[in-house]
């Protein structure tokens, strides 16, 4: 009986050793010393990716710094808004920080050499002062710093300032025009502007055709209204020609602008199209001779002429006369003819040779030549 009891206890002890894991299973590798003994779990963990600033996406161009301030009452200064409304008669004083400041203001003030305008450069700032302001002074006022090397200066685009100012005046909803009838040329290769600018920011402006009488809608695709420019024809064509005017309404009052004649110009923009012709290419001594230089171009593009001729070095007296006129070629097409005539009296041997004419406009220049010989 005791033998069976001892045998049972021995078998129970063997079973307990297997359960407590004192003998490692044959199908599992024993852990090496120092090996991580933390059991892995099946939980998925989203890796954290550190945020890296994209240097390439940063704008490398420096931010423009506004250098303009406006003189307020009691000696206070503040940066002007993009648009300002001032009552006509007020004094305007603008300052721009810098020891070399360039200015731009409505061309009206330059055209008439207006003494109401004063521009001064001080040691640390530029100053623009306009006294006795009127509705005609409405427009863009801007300034910029200048980077100079010797006598050559260039605009510093990082230091600029600008504001568009409406000078409101009783009875003047439109910026006054020096004439009662203006001409606007329509070119197929660029925008055309009917300059109906107002003096009141909140004014409602419409465009009208005189005959047949109707309103011309500014639909945003063919014609748009720009507060600072007027009605802009985005793609002018022959059908736009005619007489138009603008109507402004503000504060229960309305006003009609001057009339504008829209003329279509078919000559494309570019350097002058120039020809030269002598009254005779063989001239006898003592006779008179003239050389004509002609340019066909756009109606609103001015042309300048320069001459080179045989007797120029010897200061041979010549007469040079420039002129221009518009030619209407039907269907509203208009061309400008600019001419320069060089005339010589009592032709001499010294006058024989090449006569060279150079015509220049804003797009470039063209040089033509002809010979005049002594017969």
UniProtKB/Swiss-Prot annotation:
This is Platelet-derived growth factor receptor-like protein. Keywords: Disulfide bond, Glycoprotein, Immunoglobulin domain, Repeat, Secreted, Signal. InterPro entries: Ig-like_dom, Ig-like_dom_sf, Ig-like_fold, Ig_sub, Ig_sub2, PDGFRL. Residues 20-64 are annotated as: Disordered. Glycans are attached at residues 132, 219. It is found in: Secreted. The gene is PDGFRL. GO terms for cellular component: extracellular region.
